[in-house]
Amino acid sequence: MEDDMRKLPERFISFTKAYPEIAAAYETLAGKCRESGPLDERDQTLVKLGVAIGSGLEGSVHSQVRKSLDAGVSPDEIRHAFMLAMTAIGFPKTMATFTWAEDILKDE
């Protein structure tokens, strides 16, 4: 199960195959955004995790949890990000997004 949750979603893979130029342009934009400021990769993933939590989008939460782990953020640090979100987005939304994070973190 762990390998299934850590791999890229089929929807993403099929999109990049169907629209390689758009996918490449998006990756270029993402790279320029990462390079545009002083935050290191680890901090960038935590910021984007917070945005994903606030957006309430399951795919985004899954993606940012995976990227945070890949950047060296510990599972406990990721869980702490969800606790910090609680007072900003409310308990029910935090619980929903935390459930999505645990899809990936439960095997870490």
Task: Describe these PLM feature segments.
Residues 1-44, 70, 94-108:
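Acidic, glycine/proline-rich low-complexity segments that act as flexible tails and inter-domain linkers
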Residues 54-83:
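Mid-chain, well-packed structural core segment of small domains
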